Amino acid sequence: MNHESEPSRSLRLGLCCIFRDEPIKFRNTTVKFLRSMDRDAASLKLSTLCLANADALLAALTFCDTAGIGCFRINSQILPVKTHDECGYDVADLPDGPEILSRFKACGTFAKERGIRTSFHPDQFIVLNSPKPDVVDRSVAELEYQAEVAEWVGADVINIHGGGAYGDKPSALAAFARNLARLSDRARTRLTVENDDVTYTPADLLPVCRNEGIPLVYDVHHHRCNQDNISIEEATEQALKTWQREPLFHISSPIEGWDGPKPRRHHDFIDIRDFPECWRGMKLTVEVEAKAKEVAVLKLKRQLAEQWFVYILRCADGSLYTGITNDLDRRLSQHNAGTASRYTRSRLPVVLAYQEKQPHKSAALKRELAIKALSRTAKETLIIQSNV
């Protein structure tokens, strides 16, 4: 199986499952509702929902292609109640079975042609290392269902958490590793594991990933909440080594900030300061776990594309002026036109004496304050050193 997504890109951002503003909806149902119908009516209802969700998936992928979003995470309920003991079904047995399969495969063809990666992230009830055999049985069944759809659409990632520790992490991780043997090849080769915000850190999971050949989906928010003895940079480096295809990581920000009472809760948007500097420029997929969904992804995309600079101008009277901008040429023109700063307005013309790139606006503001606090001699030294 070829897991590579074409065409190759550098950093790509991923949208997770649903939309905030776009009128693209995935449909679901309940076991209670299906039980209220006779068998044929329930089968027809499920068939209709599956067709609608295949069409919604194509619409989602089309939006991603148009918006320049490089990855889409598919909802685990794309085939509603697929593995339920009573109401579960095989797609082939539904009234529109062949058409459902055809439409999902068309989604896979579209995604491949447009270079859009797809992934799955099963719900938290997937626990491969549970001490309860029935929980493991249901987890395996759910992973197999998602692997079936993943094969249709060309998704290369089915991501899960490590599960519980049950008072003994080594034994729990050993059970996780043993139960991998229960998975089919199409599920096993797509399986990834993610560090969580309570139990398993990157340091806990990396040995299992290396021994079992499972890629680590590094979640930097979870790592900041559930820390170990390795840095973000080292965790990134070690996680990258577990991948034989394009790595996939997660980013999110705490809704109440890192000093808030519940830092695990996700914000509507990503604070650009939370995006690891070492991720920039990598050939990497970063799924954006933010409540504002596509709006948050597109905002982060714009922010990552921005270039911020701290600069020093030498004015006509010999004085120095320090500022920040995300458009250096335009800002210099504004200064010389007398529309940028009251200080430089009476000291024209000005020339650019020093510039320093920063990853985002907050970093630029911080650096600006540091440079402003320097003595005149120290600023001149900075200018001289930059020209050497």
Predicted regions: what they are:
Residues 169-180, 191-194:
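Multi-pass alpha-helical transmembrane bundles in non-GPCR membrane proteins
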Residues 153-167:
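Active-site groove signature of glycoside hydrolases
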Residues 200-201, 221-227:
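Short acidic, Gly/Ser-rich segments with clustered Asp/Glu that frequently serve as metal-coordination loops
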Residues 305-388:
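GIY-YIG nuclease catalytic motif and its immediate N-terminal context
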Residues 161, 192-194, 216-221, 250-252:
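Short, conserved beta-strand edge motifs with alternating hydrophobic and charged residues
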Residues 2-117, 124-139, 148-153, 182, ...:
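Alpha/beta catalytic barrel-like cores
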Residues 118-126, 216-224:
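Histidine-centered catalytic micro-motifs
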Residues 120, 193, 218, 288, ...:
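Active-site flanking residues adjacent to catalytic metal/cofactor-binding acidic residues
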